[in-house]
Amino acid sequence: KFKSVQSTNNKSIKLIQKFKYSSGLVVSEIQTKGKGTMGKKWISKKGNIFITIFFKVDFTKYNIKNFLIMNVKIIKKVLKRYTKKNIIIKKPNDLLIENKKICGILQEVIEYNNDKFLITGIGINTFVAPFNKKFIATCLCNHTKKIINNLEIIKNIKNVYEKMINDLNNNNFTYVKNKYI
């Protein structure tokens, strides 16, 4: 866990390259240069969740597009524990409540030492809805009667991903896809 990083995805890549980690979770209280899709900036407001999950993947066995679908559905399922409101997937990688963005997911693949890694950055507006002229955002605390605890949400996400990675290592992809999609 970090107080501040430029981006959790970039920090993950550095951990892979410097320490040769094969998987991990990077959490930061703030990102100074958060990344969105197509080179856009992710607006990172303190109090929200900024994490990246990374792990080694054999892409000869798995289709990268399936991971994006799984990632979005995993996070949607975790967030549904906290709200009765309908959470909609805005393809390819955003989650919306009442047509307002609550979560964005950035998926990248890097190659290092002949291994490929899936880097999945997740930004969730839990307490602060950032202002953006291009889209309207919301935050989870505006759509729930439950107490929001970022560490609990991160732990829930981590647990699901640990199970998924274990399933990937011990089962065929059809099994994993059926379980998580």
Task: Label the model's feature ranges.
Residues 20-22, 89-91, 100:
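Short, basic and Ser/Thr-rich N-terminal targeting/leader segments
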Residues 26, 91, 118-120:
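Residue-level marker for buried hydrophobic side chains located in beta-strands
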Residues 1-81, 85, 147:
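N-terminal lobe of the biotin/lipoate ligase/transferase fold
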Residues 3, 89-91, 174:
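Short loop/edge segments at beta-strand edges and connector loops
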Residues 59-87, 97-181:
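Long, positively charged amphipathic alpha-helical accessory segments at protein N-termini or as interdomain linkers
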